[in-house]
Amino acid sequence: MPLQAIDLNSDVGESFGNYTLGLDEQVIPLISSANIACGYHAGDPAVMRHTVALAIKNGVGLGAHPGLPDLVGFGRRNMEVTLEEIKDFVTYQIGALQAVAALQGARLQHVKPHGALYNMAVKNPAIWDAVAEVMAGIDERLILFVMAGSDRAELESIAKRRGV
């Protein structure tokens, strides 16, 4: 029987500017993959750099955690946006974190949308499709992380069609 493992995953890198949020220094050594905020709902370039370095030091898989451009609402407020805007938001954030990781000799492993973007996608599969399209265009090796209890068959179909 093959060895099975559970991926312990956490949202991290959500501090920005002078504001420290979360317990990244304590949490990251305990997890196997990290969803790192990419600047729209939380995080900033310095926090992203520090969080990536901490994850690498602890052998933790790097993931982009793109959200809607909503610092005030922490990315938890729904917005009326088009699929093209969602693609732009996700492209920008994955690209930023991908560059931060590359400068430290690492690559991204996964993408897990944040907050309202995730919740909007649960209700609208076209949003999942838009996210998967961007992921495939950036790096087909990226894994789309979703919450337990999601419609697995539908999400697998979208991911397979998009090549992620």
Tell me what each language-model feature is.
Residues I6-S10, A34-I36, L62-P66, Q109-P113, ...:
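Hydrophobic faces of well-ordered beta-strands that scaffold small-molecule active sites
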Residues V12, L54-V81:
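Glycine-rich nucleotide/cofactor/substrate-binding loop typically near the N-terminus or early
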Residues F16-R49:
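A short alpha/beta connector and helix-capping loop motif
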Residues E25-P29, H50-G63, A102-G105, A136:
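Acidic (Asp/Glu)-rich catalytic clusters
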Residues I36-H41, M120-A121, R141-G149:
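Catalytic beta/alpha-barrel core
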Residues L71-G105, H110:
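Glycine/small-residue-rich loop that forms an oxyanion/phosphate-binding "nest" at active or ligand-binding sites
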Residues N124-A130:
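Charged helix-capping and loop-helix junction motifs
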Residues V131-V164:
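A contiguous pocket-lining binding segment that forms or flanks enzyme active sites
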